[in-house]
Amino acid sequence: MTRLTSFFLFFFVSLMATTAMAEDKASKALALTPPMGWNTWNKFGCNVSEGLVKGAADAMVASGMKDAGYQYIVIDDCWQVKRDEKGNIVPYPDRFPNGIKAVADYVHSKGLKFGIYSDAGTKTCGGKPGGLGHEYQDAIDYAAWGVDYLKYDWCNTLPGQDARASYQNIRQALDAAGRPIVLSICEWGGRQPWLWGEEVGGNLWRTTEDIQDRWAGKKEWSPGHCCSNGMLDIVDENEPLYSHAGPGHWNDPDMLEVGNGGMTNAEYRTHFSLWAIMAAPLMAGNDIRSMNPDIREILINKEVIAVDQDALGQQGRRVWKDGDLEVWSKQLQDGGRAVVLLNRGASPQAVTATWEQVGYPGHVSAGVRDLWGHKDLGKFTGKFSAPVESHGVVVVTIKP
C-alpha cells in the first residue's frame, strides 16, 4: 500500500468517525426533557386526515396546551397508502389532498412541531407500507416535509430481524437527511430497548405493550394475541426501569388516555400524575378539539407538568408500598422532591410520606405544596400525611 493510499484511507476513516460522532451528539441533543404533544392513535386509530390534524393544531393553541408546554402534533398509522414506481411513500390523496408537507407547514405556522409514523417492518401495524428497505429514501422525504418527530413501530418485521440494528439504521438515515428529528422507538419493550436505545440514537422507547383506557387489567387484543395493559399494569412494568431514563433518552410507558372515557376523572389525575413523576413523554391521545373543562384542567396543570419536565431528568420511583398504598418520589433540580401519595384501593385512606423515604434527614423542616390544589400547605418536620381518595393521588413538592 502506497503512502498516498494509506493517507486517503486514514482520512476517509477519520471523516466517517467524525461524522458518526457528530450525528450521535446531534441526536442526544434532542428531547432533553420528555416530549409533550398529541398523537392521533388512541382516539382516532386509522381515521386520520388533514382536517383532523389541522384542527388538533388549532385546539392545542386555543386550549392553552401549547402555553403549558405541548409542542408535537403527531400523525400515527394509516396516513400512507402505497409506494410509487420510484419507491417513494405516498399519503392517501383523499385524506391528505395537499400532501404531508402542507400539513407540517400548517402545524409549524402555529408555533408547534410535526411528527409522523412509520414501521421497521414490511408493513405498519395497520397494514400500510412499512419502512424496511426504504429507510434512507423515507428519511429524505421526512426532512423535506419538515418532520420533527418520528414514531417507528415494530409490526410485520422479518424472521430474525434485529431490532437494535433496525433502529440504528433509521437513526443513521434521519441524521444523513440533515434535519433534527426525535426518534421514538416503539417495539413494545420485548427486546429491552432501555439497554440499547440510547446507544443507537433513540430519544425514547416504549417499555410495555399498548395501553388501554382502563384502570388496571391485561386484555387480549384478539384470541391468542396478547396483550394490552390497563394503566396500573403499565406503571408497574415501567417503574423498575428508572435508572435508564435521563435527558435525551426516556422510558416511554405509552401515550396518555386522559379524556377518552374509560376512567374516572380521579383516575385520569392519577394517570397523569404517575406519568409526570416517571418523567414519561406526555403525548395526549384524546380529542383535544372537544374536551371538557375537567379534562383540559388535568392536561394543562402546569405544576404537575413541571415535575415531568424538570431539567434534572430523573425518573421518579416507588419508595414505599403497603398493600394498596404507595409513596413515589422524584428528585428535582432545585434539590426538592416531587412526591405522589397513591391509593389504589376502593375506599379513601390516609397516606404518609416520611422524609427518610424521599431522601431527607428526619429532623429537617420542609415546605410542602399541593400541586393539584395549587396551594402551599405549610412547614412539616419528618413526614407529611394526607387523605387520598379511592384510585386517587395527592401530589406535592417537598423542599427544606
What are these regions (language model features)?
Residues 56, 60-159:
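Aromatic-lined carbohydrate-binding/catalytic grooves of carbohydrate-active enzymes
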Residues 20-24:
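Boundary at the C-terminal end of the N-terminal hydrophobic targeting segment
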Residues 6-17:
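Bacterial N-terminal signal peptides
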Residues 134-137, 182-286:
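Glycan-recognition surfaces
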Residues 275-278, 283-285, 321-360, 391:
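Carbohydrate-binding surface patches
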Residues 378-400:
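C-terminal beta-strand-rich structural cap/linker in extracellular carbohydrate-active enzymes
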Residues 270-319:
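Catalytic cores of secreted or luminal carbohydrate-active enzymes
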Residues 34-40, 69-76, 113-118, 148-153, ...:
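Structural recognition of the beta-strand scaffold that forms the well-ordered cores
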